[in-house]
């Protein structure tokens, strides 16, 4: 089940031929065909006990998408809800490597090959292999007019400034 779940997530995130709408959803019927599964199997995959929820069904349960990490552009406001109150964010950190830290401290966090800058919702959500944690000053960031979104999986995403960068002045 776990390998099928990972294959579905990879397909929904990265397959350029996957028929996704602006919110990155595709029909569950399409998934049934592509992966030769039925509704019961899909429900079992969605409900796998894991520390990271990677797949989401639409409210009507007829569409499915990967939580985040898409290779093609997806409208951030359609992947989650805007965060307007700093008090609603308990944990907003970005995991990185010590090797990358010097450049980040100088230039800021960049989206790199992704479409958005991702932040973890808790310690277990921090990117594997991270040996440095950068914490975002959420009140200062929001006061500056920058936008944060809580994704469906609970993690947080930001586009940064017009250059897609979060400057070090917003780090704690």
Model-flagged regions — what are they?
Residues 1-117, 123-172:
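Conserved NAD+-utilizing ADP-ribose enzyme module
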């Amino acid at each position: 089940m776990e390998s099928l779940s990972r294959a579905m997530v990879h397909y929904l995130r990265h397959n350029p031929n996957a028929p996704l709408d602006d919110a990155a959803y595709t029909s569950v019927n399409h998934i049934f065909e592509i992966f030769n599964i039925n509704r019961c199997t899909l429900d079992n995959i969605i409900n796998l006990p894991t520390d990271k929820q990677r797949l989401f069904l639409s409210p009507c349960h007829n569409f499915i998408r990967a939580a985040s990490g898409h290779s093609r552009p997806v409208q951030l406001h359609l992947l989650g809800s805007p965060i307007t109150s700093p008090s609603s964010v308990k944990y907003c950190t970005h995991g990185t490597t010590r090797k990358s830290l010097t450049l980040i401290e100088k230039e800021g966090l960049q989206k790199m090959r992704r479409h958005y800058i991702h932040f973890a919702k808790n310690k277990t959500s921090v990117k594997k292999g991270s040996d440095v944690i950068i914490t975002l000053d959420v009140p200062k960031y929001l006061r500056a007019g920058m936008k944060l979104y809580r994704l469906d999986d609970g993690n947080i995403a930001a586009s940064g400034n017009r250059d897609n960068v979060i400057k070090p002045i917003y780090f704690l």
